[in-house]
Amino acid sequence: MTNLKQVLTADISCQLLYVNETQASQVESLQALIAKHKLPIILNAELVTEKLNQKRRQQLSQIVTQPILLLDEKDKLSWLSEGLSVAPEWDKLQRRVVSAGRKSELLLQAAKLTADSEVIDATAGFGHDSLILASTGAQVTMLEQQPLMALLLLVEQLRMSTLPNWQKLMSRLQIINTDALTYFARFNNYLGNGNEQAIDVIYLDPMFPEDSYQDSKTGKGAKVGKHMQALHQLAHPPTLDEEQQLLQSAQAVVSQNGQKQGRVIVKRPQFAPSLADQQPSESWNNEAVRFDGYFV
C-alpha cells in the first residue's frame, strides 16, 4: 500500500481510473484544472473495463504503489482509500447547510460570523466545515496542503457550481493548495505593505491521533468516519512545536483586524488537550467535539 505521507511531500504520481470511453473529455478537464492551479500532480489515466466492485477496490488499495483516483460511472471523482471511495460529497450536506445557524451549529456559536466576515479555513480537508462557515454569507478562503485533497475540493466546487441552489455559496469559497504557515507569512507581509484586507476568523482543525476521540479513562468516545480515516493517511498529527507555531501565526493574522476583535477557532476531539497546550479564551462542546476560541 502506498505511503501517502511520504509521497505527498513531492510531486505526486497519481493513477486515475475511469470506466467509460466517453469520459476522456473529463480526464482532459482534470488535467487542465491541475495545470491551472499548478498542483504538483502527475495524472496517469487508464480506462478500466472490469467492474470495480468492493472486493476489487480493496485489492487495488493493497497492491498499487501510488494514490488512486476513480472516475465512476456517475462521473463522480473520488479517492480510493483502503478500498473505500471517499470524496467531499457536499450535496449530502444540503439539509445541514440550509438549516445551519448558531442554535444548531456549535462552530457558528464559536465563530460568531456575519455576512461581511472574512474567514480562513486553514485546514480544509474535505471542506465540510467550510460550507457551514460560508452558509452565514461569509467569504471563506480554504487552505489545503495536500494536492490530492485540493484537487478533490476544486472538482467538487465546479460540480456544485452547476446546481442553481449552490451557486451563491460556491462563489464565496476560494480554494488554495498551500500550507497554513506559508500562507499566514505571505498574508502578514501583504498587510505590512499597507493593504487593508483583514481576517475576522481563522479556523483550525489540525490532525490528531486516531484515539483522541476516546476518553482515556473509559475508552468510550465517538467513532471515526471514513473521511477522517482517509485524512489520517495523508498527514501526521503536528508536534507540540508545530502546534505552537500554527496557533501563534494564526493569532498574528487576526490581530491585524483594526478595532474589531479577531478570533482563532480550533476544533478538537472532546477529550483531546488544548492545541499547543494553550488555554482558550472560551470553549463550546458537545459529546463528541470541542471548539476552543482564542480571542485577539
UniProtKB/Swiss-Prot annotation:
<keyword id="KW-0489">Methyltransferase</keyword>
<comment type="similarity">
    <text>Belongs to the methyltransferase superfamily. RsmJ family.</text>
</comment>
<dbReference type="Pfam" id="PF04445">
    <property type="entry name" value="SAM_MT"/>
</dbReference>
<dbReference type="InterPro" id="IPR029063">
    <property type="entry name" value="SAM-dependent_MTases_sf"/>
</dbReference>
<keyword id="KW-0963">Cytoplasm</keyword>
<dbReference type="GO" id="GO:0005737">
    <property type="term" value="C:cytoplasm"/>
</dbReference>
<feature type="binding site">
    <location>
        <position position="205"/>
    </location>
    <ligand>
        <name>S-adenosyl-L-methionine</name>
    </ligand>
</feature>
<protein>
    <recommendedName>
        <fullName>Ribosomal RNA small subunit methyltransferase J</fullName>
        <ecNumber>2.1.1.242</ecNumber>
    </recommendedName>
</protein>
<keyword id="KW-0698">rRNA processing</keyword>
<dbReference type="InterPro" id="IPR007536">
    <property type="entry name" value="16SrRNA_methylTrfase_J"/>
</dbReference>
<keyword id="KW-0949">S-adenosyl-L-methionine</keyword>
<dbReference type="GO" id="GO:0008990">
    <property type="term" value="F:rRNA (guanine-N2-)-methyltransferase activity"/>
</dbReference>
<comment type="function">
    <text>Specifically methylates the guanosine in position 1516 of 16S rRNA.</text>
</comment>
<keyword id="KW-0808">Transferase</keyword>
